[in-house]
Each structure stands twice: as structure tokens, then as C-alpha cells.
Amino acid sequence: MVNLILVGPMGAGKSTIGRLLAKELHLAFKDSDKEIEQRCGANIPWIFDVEGEVGFREREQAMLTELCAADGMVIATGGGAVMRDGNRQVLRAGGRVVYLHASVEHQIARTARDRNRPLLQKPNPGQILRDLMALRDPLYREIADVVVETDERPPRLVVQEILERLRKLPPR
């Protein structure tokens, strides 16, 4: 089976929905950020502190290339994975891409107390999320086969909508 690749902003529910999708479809689930942390033996904030965002993005690109080369997985990506052209090409070629859209207001609510998000550990995280969304939303849409709204929706309903929408797509 082709991979299902979840893209979207932080706080959209990629990991939660990805696990549920994988269970429903009897597929393996991989979270690219968690895979990077396991390989490095360090968390994302530490990698950002030591290697900077560029160093982290290099690791991310290598991980996405590896994960997308396999088949039959649900893959949750980091929110910034779409920023590199090479990543977008890998993701697009690596399977069906589902953009989990969340409004900035919901992103703020879902990430407010999460200290594991280096890009938000600055003054005015709400403005940071607005700026990131303005930059990334067109890139998520560029590679998405399906766009699904996650605001005010239980994860199981989002999973059902994803499955219904994917069934309606022509085969690749």
C-alpha cells in the first residue's frame, strides 16, 4: 500500500491522527520528528540549540527521504518539512499527502504549554504562528492530495473524513 503522509502546522494533530489512521489501516506509524530524536539521542530543542535550524532541516530531509522510500506507512511530518523544495518533491513522490489544516487560533490553544517547540520559545508565539502559516499554507496546499480541517473536530471524525476522501481519489 502507498504511504499516507500527513503535513500541516504544529498543533494540527498530525501525530494523534496519524496513529489513529495507522491503527485503522493496520499500517506502521512513523513521526519524522520522533525518528530524528531517536537517531540523535536528543530532543528537537537540543538539536536546534546545537545545530541550528539548518542542521535540523538537514536531518529532517534525510529522514523524510528514508521514510518515503518505504511503503505501507502513515508518516507524520514536522510543520516545517515543506519549506525545502527537495522535501516537497520527496513527500509528493512518497505517497498520498494529506494536509491537516488548523486555524492559527487552534494552533495557539494546542501548543500553548508545549516547551518542545523551539520556534515558539520566543516572545509573541501567536504572531510567529501567523507568520509561519502565511508562509507555509501555500506549500502544504501545493503538495496535498487532500486538505482536511481539524478545528473543533474529534480526531476519529478527521480520520473518517481522510479515509472517505482518499477512497474517492483516482489511483496513482
Curated annotation (Swiss-Prot):
Cofactor dependence: Mg(2+)
PROSITE patterns listed in its UniProt record: SHIKIMATE_KINASE (PS01128)
Top-level taxonomic group: Bacteria
Subunit structure: Monomer.
Protein name per the record: Shikimate kinase
Primary residence: cytoplasm
Pathway assigned in UniProt: Metabolic intermediate biosynthesis; chorismate biosynthesis; chorismate from D-erythrose 4-phosphate and phosphoenolpyruvate: step 5/7
Transmembrane segments: none
Record-listed substrate binding positions: 33, 57, 79, 136
Catalytically driven reaction(s): shikimate + ATP = 3-phosphoshikimate + ADP + H(+)
Residues bound to ATP: 11-16, 117, 153
GO CC entries: cytosol
UniProt cross-references to HAMAP family, sorted A to Z: Shikimate_kinase
Pfam families: SKI (PF01202)
MF annotations from Gene Ontology: ATP binding; magnesium ion binding; shikimate kinase activity
E.C. code: 2.7.1.71
Cofactor, how bound (note): Binds 1 Mg(2+) ion per subunit.
Species of the source: Pseudomonas aeruginosa (strain ATCC 15692 / DSM 22644 / CIP 104116 / JCM 14847 / LMG 12228 / 1C / PRS 101 / PAO1)
Matching InterPro entries: P-loop_NTPase, Shikimate/glucono_kinase, Shikimate_kinase/TSH1, Shikimate_kinase_CS
GO biological process, one term: aromatic amino acid family biosynthetic process
Location in the cell: Cytoplasm
Function in brief: Catalyzes the specific phosphorylation of the 3-hydroxyl group of shikimic acid using ATP as a cosubstrate.
Keywords assigned by UniProt, alphabetized: Amino-acid biosynthesis, Aromatic amino acid biosynthesis, ATP-binding, Cytoplasm, Kinase, Magnesium, Metal-binding, Nucleotide-binding, Transferase
Disulfide-linked positions: none
Name of the top EC class for this enzyme: transferase
